[in-house]
Amino acid sequence: MQMHHFFIPEIGLLTIDTQSLPWSTKEHPMEIPMDESLELYQWMTHACPSPVPLLLGTSFQQKVWNALCKIPFGETISYQDLAIQIGQSKAFRAVAMAAAHNPFPLVIPCHRLIRSDGSIGGYSAGSGPELKEKLLLWEQRLAQELHLNSRSKQ
C-alpha cells in the first residue's frame, strides 16, 4: 500500500491510500458517445491544478509534474522539449523517470510525453505504451472534433 499526500487550499491536507490492484484490461471502444467524451474531457482538462499541490516527490519531480499539467489536451511534447522548458536541457532521462513516478497518471497527464523521434515511449499505467497510444489517439480525435464543432458554430 502506498500513501500519497497533497494539499488543496480549499480542502486542506488529503491522504490517499492506494493498493496494488491490477488494472482492468477490458477493451473500451474508441467510439464512445460524444456526451461521455465531453464529460471525460472536462474532467481531464480541469483535474490538474497548477501548480500541483503535492507534498510528495522531489522538487525536480514536482517541477516536471507541474509542467505536464500545462500540456494542452490533445497535444504532445517530447521528453527533451519538456526538459528544456523547465530549464534542464540535458535532463530528458530524468524527465522520463519523473513521469514514470507520477502518482496520478490521468490527473497529471504524463501520457502526453513522447520521444523526440515522435514514437510513443513508455507509460507506467495500465497496459503501458498500448494504453498511452489509445489515450493520445482519443484525445487528438476529440480535440479535433471539438475544434470542428466550434468552427461550425461560428
Question: Which residue ranges define each predicted feature?
Answer:
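…primarily DNA-binding HTH/wHTH and HhH modules…
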Residues: S116-Q154
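Pre-recognition alpha-helix immediately N-terminal to the DNA-recognition helix
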Residues: K63-A67, A94, K134
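Residue-level signal for inorganic ion chemistry
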Residues: L68, L82, C110-H111, L135
